[in-house]
Amino acid sequence: MGLELVTSGKNLPEEINVVIEIPKDSEPVKYEVDKASGAIFVDRILSTPMRYPCNYGYVPNTLCGDGDPADVLVVLPLPLVPGSVVRCRPVGVLRMSDEAGSDEKILAVPIEKIFSGYAHIEDIDQVSSHWMERIGHFFEHYKDLEKGKWVKLDGWGGAAEAKRILVESVERYNSDAP
């Protein structure tokens, strides 16, 4: 099944659709969904023996400055199946850069209908410091043993910044569409 029919979300930027590529606590394998076919490809095996601290995916029909769809970290105590789509609310953004340039990660929680445990979270300051520390540690170190690769964390931004990034990424996608 191709994912081209999955929208960015019904009420963007307040609610977004996230296509899961990597489940929370999965082995150190980086998967990527092929946007045209929907097939899940192994991108690479991470050199560090680290597990992803949360579900990792992207928002369809978005395009960020790095040429990829908007990356999303879905905070949830359970792993989700790669290729599944989960409706979320953006609550913050991890500002970071790597050897390829700027590479922000939107932090999101599932909508209340999917998981009511995070219904109270509206902005980054309401996310547990434990979650934020785990996420920051993972992304600061997951490329440590890969030659020529590096990551620099540039801090956290709130929900308003995350929503601005999402709106800009949809506009960029639409302006680049044939």
UniProtKB/Swiss-Prot annotation:
Q: Which cofactor does it need?
A: Mg(2+)
Instruction: Tell whether Acetylation is among the UniProt keywords.
Output: no
Q: Per the record's keyword annotation, is Magnesium included, yes or no?
A: yes
Give the matching InterPro entries.
Pyrophosphatase (IPR008162), Pyrophosphatase_sf (IPR036649)
Q: Name one GO cellular component term.
A: cytosol
Q: Which residues bind substrate?
A: K30, R44, Y56, Y142
Tell me which domain of life the UniProt entry assigns to the organism this sequence originates from: Bacteria
**GO term, biological process aspect, one:** phosphate-containing compound metabolic process
Q: What class of enzyme is it?
A: hydrolase
The main location class comes to cytoplasm
Positions of Mg(2+) 2 binding: D71
Listed PANTHER family = INORGANIC PYROPHOSPHATASE
| Entry-linked HAMAP family | Inorganic_PPase
The record's family statement is: Belongs to the PPase family.
Quaternary structure (record): Homohexamer.
What is the protein name given in its UniProt record? Inorganic pyrophosphatase
Origin species, per record, is Xanthomonas campestris pv. campestris (strain ATCC 33913 / DSM 3586 / NCPPB 528 / LMG 568 / P 25)
State the organism's lineage: Bacteria, Pseudomonadati, Pseudomonadota, Gammaproteobacteria, Lysobacterales
Gene assigned in the entry: ppa
